[in-house]
């Protein structure tokens, strides 16, 4: 018996029912060129059935799987086609339209939807499903956590209604019906959404940004132009308003708009500071009334937080700066206008480093006059005594030579500036002065005796 006949006999012997024969023909596919195509999974009638194949219709091991992969024992309604999505009759339809699970998806994929036109995506990469209801989370936040697997409709951001709730609020730019006298048309831009960067809150009276465009220039905002505005410096905005007030071509007024959710609780951080680091992602309410409570002139040169109800910051009041910056919980308000036409008085600003002249701590205590000074005054020499007193006062007033004054005060007051020699021998002038003083004393004693007699 040849080997071919033996293989045929073995194969026919392994077939136990007509269903196996039908199964074999079903697993054998013929293409347009009448070329036989082998089955993607092996048929092993004598082995146990692959449980994963029976449950999902595919096998991760492919031809190397050692178990049997019968098509007749598949659950009712499951029809597996290679390179196609599975059809599972009785299961809910897979509504993604771009199934990333492929043959392992447990939902039904009807033929009329398989191979249909591709799913359209918006500018954010989210699916647009015409006929389905809009995704509520996307309409509120501008994001979708399910991505391409979401079964709801995600329209383009510019087609959403601008209700202030979406982070990507965009709308068209209708022009006002009446033109200006100079032939220019006003275009009202929608309000900007709440920014995530903290900045000083300056309340504005207008809710929209007027922007005048000449028809001859043709400068119209493009469709879908984002209205999100970054954080701006209020001092720069005021300067821009002053500079643009003299121009008749363009008038720009920068405003800010804060969305609020009446059905949600108020943001405590926003109510205390006027800013919120989460921006549009914050789930709490940011009421507009909070912006109207702060006075419009609470500005300082380095844009520190102004907290009217809190005590004044000691560092800012004394030195003009605060090391804590925007995190300081005290008040840093200055009631002044940095762009006042009358000019800014420098005396109104706090001195960064106050300077006080140094005070001398060396105190001079003068000694009482000695009897020799009184004797000199009584002997008819007031000029020498007066000169000595003036010289002593000058020495007391001069702080640069304290040691010299102390040496002079330690000498005996004899009406002269001479000092004794190191060998303690008086010179001729000193001896002469001593003789004169002795004569004066003797004459004084004689005069007193004459008066007594």
Swiss-Prot record:
Report the PROSITE patterns cross-referenced here.
Answer: ZF_C3H1
Residue ranges annotated as compositionally biased, kind Basic and acidic residues, are 17-32, 391-407, 441-453
Quick one: where's region Disordered?
A: 1-47, 360-453
| Compositional bias ranges of the Polar residues kind | 1-15, 360-379, 413-422
Q: Which residues carry this modification: N-acetylserine?
A: 2
Q: Entry's Gene3D superfamilies?
A: 2.30.30.1190, Zinc finger, CCCH-type
Entry keyword set:
Acetylation, DNA-binding, Metal-binding, Nucleus, Repeat, Zinc, Zinc-finger
Checking Pfam families in the record gives: zf-CCCH
Predominantly, its location class is nucleus
Mind naming one GO cellular-component term on file for this protein?
nucleus
Q: Name one GO molecular function term.
A: zinc ion binding
**Where located?**
Nucleus
ZnF bounds (C3H1-type) = 44-72, 95-112, 129-157, 261-289, 307-335
Q: What is this protein called?
A: Zinc finger CCCH domain-containing protein 26
Which organism is this entry from? Answer: Arabidopsis thaliana (Mouse-ear cress)
What gene makes this protein? ZFN2
């Amino acid at each position: 018996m040849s080997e071919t006949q033996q293989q045929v006999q073995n194969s026919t012997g392994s077939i136990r029912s007509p269903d196996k024969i039908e199964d074999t023909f079903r697993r054998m596919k013929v293409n347009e060129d009448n070329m036989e195509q082998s089955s993607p999974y092996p048929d092993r009638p004598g082995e146990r059935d692959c449980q994963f194949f029976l449950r999902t219709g595919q096998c991760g091991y492919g031809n190397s799987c050692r178990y049997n992969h019968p098509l007749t024992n598949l659950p009712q309604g499951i029809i597996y086609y290679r390179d196609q999505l599975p059809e599972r009759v009785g299961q809910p339809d897979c509504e993604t339209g771009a199934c990333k699970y492929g043959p392992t998806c447990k939902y039904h994929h009807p033929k009329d939807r398989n191979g249909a036109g591709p799913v359209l995506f918006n500018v954010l990469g989210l699916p647009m499903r015409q006929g389905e209801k809009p995704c509520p989370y996307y309409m509120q936040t501008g994001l979708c956590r399910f991505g391409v697997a979401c079964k709801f409709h995600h329209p383009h951001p510019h087609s959403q209604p601008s209700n202030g709730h979406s982070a990507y609020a965009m709308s068209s730019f209708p022009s006002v019906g009446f033109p200006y006298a100079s032939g220019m048309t006003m275009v009202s831009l929608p309000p900007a959404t709440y920014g995530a960067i903290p900045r000083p809150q300056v309340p504005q009276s207008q809710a929209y940004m007027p922007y005048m465009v000449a028809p001859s220039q043709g400068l119209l905002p493009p469709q879908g132009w984002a209205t999100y505005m970054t954080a701006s410096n209020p001092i720069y905005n005021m300067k821009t308003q002053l500079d643009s007030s003299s121009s008749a071509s363009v008038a720009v007024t920068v405003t800010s708009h804060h969305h609020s959710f009446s059905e949600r609780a108020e943001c405590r951080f926003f109510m205390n500071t006027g800013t919120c680091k989460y921006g549009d992602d914050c789930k709490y309410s940011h009421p507009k009334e909070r912006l109207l409570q702060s006075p419009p002139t609470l500005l300082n040169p380095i844009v520190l937080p102004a907290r009217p109800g809190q005590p004044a910051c000691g560092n800012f009041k004394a030195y003009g700066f605060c090391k804590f910056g925007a995190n300081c919980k005290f008040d840093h308000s200055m009631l002044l206008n940095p762009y006042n036409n009358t000019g800014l008085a420098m005396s109104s600003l706090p001195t960064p480093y106050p300077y006080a002249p140094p005070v001398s701590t060396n105190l001079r205590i003068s000694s009482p006059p000695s009897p020799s000074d009184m004797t000199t005054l009584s002997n008819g020499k007031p000029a020498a005594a007066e000169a000595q007193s003036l010289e002593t006062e000058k020495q007391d007033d001069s702080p640069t030579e304290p040691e010299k004054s102390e040496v002079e005060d330690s000498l005996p007051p004899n009406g002269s500036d001479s000092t004794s020699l190191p060998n303690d021998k008086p010179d001729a002038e000193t001896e002469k002065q001593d003789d004169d003083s002795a004569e004066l004393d003797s004459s004084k004693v004689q005069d007193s005796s004459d008066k007594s007699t």
